[in-house]
Swiss-Prot record:
Coiled coil: none annotated. This is Histidinol dehydrogenase. It comes from Listeria monocytogenes serovar 1/2a (strain ATCC BAA-679 / EGD-e). GO terms for molecular function: histidinol dehydrogenase activity; NAD binding; zinc ion binding. Its cofactor is Zn(2+). The gene is hisD. Belongs to the histidinol dehydrogenase family. GO terms for biological process: L-histidine biosynthetic process.
Length: 427
């Protein structure tokens, strides 16, 4: 893991050099072909692609209700308790995000307002196959339920022995309405276009590999999506009082995700930089996913020694990380200096996995610098706003001349006429 020093511009160039997503033309071409086949052949294309990509020959796509209900009996009861605790925290946090309708009548004869309506049908993508991500089920489904989405459709790739019971148990607990054992770009295509079995949805959310991300980009506009997620990333800000073992473990918690994951420490202390580097090498030896984490640390990892605290925040805000840990003395004092970050962890005991699984804020976060303009997944992502207005004749009469003037200045005479015609009988 490189230790970097230099001017702020030199340091930014170092970290920006890796800040790109793999958007190969070959993947895009393959995904377009997959989408077209699903549009043309429907369910049969899903059976074919599931056999080709997952090595599983399906006879039906929908997971039966009995299989979902029996999943809880196949998992450790302690897991179910932990899942219920996480669910309570996620619901508690996200329920505070609910937007509200409003109505005002500040002028005589004028009523204006806003309606908040949930989306009708949402598709949730949950990575699957050999891996299991029940936390992803909760983080994507629960905000949609709180928003009032009527139909939640989940898709996840199958393994040879079906779908992981931990994922099914999480789906039942969260309140998923339908589950289909299909994944990849073909699963995204099915949600966007609909097939004989899978309904077309209004929005698709959830993480996935580059094929899933590319497919989401391709269908955006036909349906809404949450975001295009890149590899996971973390930036830790640390002063001379931080614990190098804590820092190293948190950096590795992201590095083990993916060889392209980015783990960056920014510190004002050379001693902390060197001790953290040693801790990373030490802790790597005991990781089951050592090969992935080590490759990530070697190719994407950085330790930056900043000149001062302000420079730490300047560099971090330019990176706009998915996860930001502030391991500084009195971390709450620095909240105002944070402009661009997906999720923020304050203090030595707010470790990033706390947010991944349990604390309540969402773990579906903007990556690759998009925290400059995107937000974490939330309840508002599953709602839409409509405005309404009502004017009496007397209220419109007071403002008609201004409206007509504006319309004519834009050369839209029919707009002007639509106002004028309502008062012609008086002339």
């Amino acid at each position: 893991m490189k230790i970097l020093t230099g001017t702020i511009n030199e340091l930014l160039n170092e970290v920006k050099a890796e800040n790109n997503t793999n958007n190969s033309l070959q993947v895009e071409s393959e995904v377009k072909s997959i989408i077209e086949k699903v549009k043309k052949d429907g369910d049969q294309a899903l059976f074919d692609f599931t056999s080709q990509f997952d090595g599983v020959r399906l006879t039906e796509l929908r997971v039966q209700t009995a299989d979902i209900q029996s999943a809880s009996s196949k998992v450790d009861p302690a897991f179910l308790v932990a899942l219920q605790q996480a669910k309570a925290n996620i619901e508690s946090f996200h329920s505070k995000q609910k937007q509200h309708a409003f109505l005002d009548s500040e002028k005589d004869g004028v009523i204006r307002g806003q309606l908040i309506r949930p989306l009708e049908t949402v598709g949730i993508y949950v990575p699957g196959g050999t891996a299991a991500y029940p936390s992803s089920v909760l983080m994507n489904v629960l905000p949609a339920k709180i928003a009032g989405v009527k139909r939640i459709v989940m898709i996840t790739p199958p393994a040879e022995n079906g779908i992981n019971p931990h994922v099914l148990a999480a789906a039942q607990l969260a309140g998923v309405d339908e589950i289909y054992q299909v994944g990849g770009a073909h699963g995204i295509a099915a949600l966007a276009h609909g097939t004989e079995s899978i309904p077309k949805v209004d929005k698709i959310v959830g993480p996935g590999n580059i094929y899933v991300a590319t497919a989401k980009r391709e269908v955006f506009g036909l349906v809404d999506i949450d975001m295009i997620a890149g590899p996971s990333e973390i930036v830790v800000l640390a002063d001379e009082n931080a614990n190098p073992a804590f820092i190293a473990s948190d950096l590795l918690s992201q590095a083990e995700h993916d060889i392209l994951a980015r783990a960056i420490l920014i510190t004002t202390s050379k001693k902390i930089a060197e001790e953290t580097q040693n801790e990373i090498n030490k802790q790597l030896e005991n990781l089951p996913r050592k090969a992935i984490a080590q490759k990530s640390i070697e190719t994407q990892g950085k330790i930056i020694i900043a000149a001062n605290t302000q420079e730490m925040f300047d560099i971090m805000n330019e990176i706009a990380p998915e996860h930001l840990e502030v391991q500084l003395e009195n971390p709450m004092n620095y909240l105002n200096q944070i402009k661009n970050a997906g999720s923020i962890f304050l203090g030595s005991y707010a470790s990033e996995p706390l947010g991944d699984y349990f604390a309540g804020p969402n773990h579906v976060l903007p990556t690759s610098g998009t925290a400059k303009f995107f937000s974490p997944l939330g309840v508002e992502d599953f709602t839409k706003r409509s405005a309404f207005i009502s004017y009496t004749k007397e209220a419109l009469a007071k403002e008609k001349d201004a409206i007509v003037l504006l319309a004519k200045k834009e050369g839209l005479d029919a707009h002007a006429k639509a106002i004028q015609i309502r008062f012609e009988e008086e002339n």
